[in-house]
Amino acid sequence: MAQVKRIRRNVSGIILLDKPLGFTSNAALQKVRWLLNAEKAGHTGSLDPLATGVLPLCFGEATKFSQYLLDSDKGYETLAQLGKTTTTADAEGEVLQERPVTVGQADIEAVLPKFRGQISQIPPMYSALKRDGQPLYKLARAGEVVEREPRSVTIARLELLAFEGDTARLAVDCSKGTYIRTLVEDIGEQLGCGAYVAELRRTQAGPFTLAQTVTLEELEAVHAEGGNEAVDRFLMPSDSGLQDWPLLQFSEASAFYWLNGQPVRAPDAPKFGMVRVQDHNGRFIGIGEVSEDGRIAPRRLIRSE
């Protein structure tokens, strides 16, 4: 007997998941996608299985804007285990070296300023970056080590929240592409004792914070009671991650031409940059970019939500 193909729903929006410990970002995405029975889904950048916290999941039309969330600044809290280094720079790796921890809180406070502002990082081998089409973590598992180019990242905030014996809890606000494992490892080397990430929790992704998230258990409970459609109540609008962008509202005529790919003028447009656009009814219809001639060129358009 032929298997009946499941008909997925055309739903759009963003669910802010508090990613559970032990899940890959994709596994978490596929679980929530199943709960929604959503046709199209994508996440906004991977969190390691060891990490928990803010993971924006995009569905339907919202997937068109996931790159802009991927490029946004992030916030983390991490627990650094001092005195050891591991193969992966976190608790999942094998211990490479152990050294005595002779530093105190004042020593840690003294080195942190060196890692604030614009710094250079060498990405870890255990990362999703690719070399000749192969993820670095696969090469690392095969015992290979390849040269990685340093990358410039910005640490806007680096604060010691607590220090106890051989652990330090840190708060980090950083630019996209920052590896917290590398940051902790580099701090450990500066202290002379080594360190790895024992815990990692993302507290912010772009405009989104932990206070806005929902747990997988909460989603499952709602689904058990009301099915796929009951989970829809957790969907945020597709432009939720773009709330700090300038907002323009087009007339009915301008919206018509713009949705058909034509740049249009808007009296309140900024002189440059990206903008969110609503139609005359206040419905989000996409994002545009201000051209040199002042017109708004369409960049990503959405269907009616």
UniProtKB/Swiss-Prot annotation:
GO terms for molecular function: RNA binding; tRNA pseudouridine(55) synthase activity. The keyword tRNA processing applies. Keywords: Isomerase, tRNA processing. The keyword Nucleus does not apply. It is an enzyme of class 5 (isomerase). Its EC number is 5.4.99.25. It comes from the Bacteria. The active site is at 48 (nucleophile). InterPro entries: PsdUridine_synth_cat_dom_sf, PsdUridine_synth_N, PUA-like_sf, PUA_sf, tRNA_psdUridine_synth_TruB, tRNA_sdUridine_synth_fam1_C, TruB_C. It catalyses: uridine(55) in tRNA = pseudouridine(55) in tRNA. GO terms for biological process: mRNA pseudouridine synthesis; tRNA pseudouridine synthesis. Belongs to the pseudouridine synthase TruB family. Type 1 subfamily. HAMAP family: TruB_bact. Responsible for synthesis of pseudouridine from uracil-55 in the psi GC loop of transfer RNAs. This is tRNA pseudouridine synthase B. It comes from Pseudomonas fluorescens (strain Pf0-1).
